Amino acid sequence: MSEFLTPERTVYDSGVQFLRPKSLDEFIGQENVKKKLSLALEAAKMRGEVLDHVLLAGPPGLGKTTLAHIIASELQTNIHVTSGPVLVKQGDMAAILTSLERGDVLFIDEIHRLNKAVEELLYSAIEDFQIDIMIGKGPSAKSIRIDIQPFTLVGATTRSGLLSSPLRSRFGIILELDFYTVKELKEIIKRAASLMDVEIEDAAAEMIAKRSRGTPRIAIRLTKRVRDMLTVVKADRINTDIVLKTMEVLNIDDEGLDEFDRKILKTIIEIYRGGPVGLNALAASLGVEADTLSEVYEPYLLQAGFLARTPRGRIVTEKAYKHLKYEVPENRLF
């Protein structure tokens, strides 16, 4: 996949902190999530209580990290940021937990990747605001209970199915983020252009939005590249011609597909007669890992209606045939 279209963070996402919304009012899209979060925040503030623990689930690039920072901002408290993979030992987690002040937000990205020992230490911390740590080794080792300040855990995950039931059940607020509409992405792009001090035409913003795979991170990334083209051609505003020139350089078509996306669909059509084809067989034909294919490449193709999963395997849809200008087979069930 093109580095410009991956929803994961890349080096092309540096220097965009100033584009992030600082409050729920500035945050575009995810209306249901915002309503639930706004209610919980307002109630906690009115009662003078610590906010319930929050789980933010959804595909990468949809604003989970931004929402975590907004939660801390709305509560006017400190945020401590870490991620599941870096918390290797219980001591790593204990050091963070004992440094928290009342009402602080602890944000753990990729919380589904916590190892079991660290996760188990977290249970008593988020439920009773206490932790038990072992002092010493061998027969003389003893457990000491330490009280910690009440805090709010905000966990983010792209794979909520990998969360253990005991951990998931300890979150009082579970929010599922979904892909954005073209209309919402257009507003995000126009806001970003304004903050970058660049004028953009409405049609140009919509053109970028349609190629952004329902993901704000991609929309911002593409907008930055379009701004580069604007600078090079010495124009005074972003119009559709400038967007098209940029997308041609990036090899991104009008449906937001890049070269490898098209290769996936063409492989199924040309080698497997449109499918069905099993994940492992398709991955072998493409020379990629099966997990990479299912977790990185497939979500957008499924969401956009180019690919479908059946009990027998993957099939391409009529939309894919038409987009790639293949003749649609007769008597084919899609």
UniProtKB/Swiss-Prot annotation:
Taxonomic superkingdom: Bacteria
Recorded consequence of changing T158V: 5% DNA-dependent ATPase activity
Positions of region (Small ATPAse domain (RuvB-S)): 182-255
Residues given in the record as DNA binding sites: R309, R314
Top-level enzyme category: hydrolase
Annotated phenotype, changing A156C: 38% DNA-dependent ATPase activity
One of the record's GO molecular function terms: ATP hydrolysis activity
GO cellular component terms attached to this protein's record: cytoplasm; Holliday junction resolvase complex
GO terms classed as biological process: DNA recombination; DNA repair
Region feature Large ATPase domain (RuvB-L), mapped onto this chain: 1-181
Keywords from the UniProt entry: ATP-binding, Cytoplasm, DNA damage, DNA recombination, DNA repair, DNA-binding, Hydrolase, Nucleotide-binding
Cellular compartment(s): Cytoplasm
EC number: 3.6.4.-
Function: The RuvA-RuvB-RuvC complex processes Holliday junction (HJ) DNA during genetic recombination and DNA repair, while the RuvA-RuvB complex plays an important role in the rescue of blocked DNA replication forks via replication fork reversal (RFR). RuvA specifically binds to HJ cruciform DNA, conferring on it an open structure. The RuvB hexamer acts as an ATP-dependent pump, pulling dsDNA into and through the RuvAB complex. RuvB forms 2 homohexamers on either side of HJ DNA bound by 1 or 2 RuvA tetramers; 4 subunits per hexamer contact DNA at a time.
Alphabetized HAMAP family for the sequence: DNA_HJ_migration_RuvB
Protein name: Holliday junction branch migration complex subunit RuvB
Native organism: Thermotoga maritima (strain ATCC 43589 / DSM 3109 / JCM 10099 / NBRC 100826 / MSB8)
Lineage, uppermost ranks: Bacteria, Thermotogati, Thermotogota, Thermotogae, Thermotogales
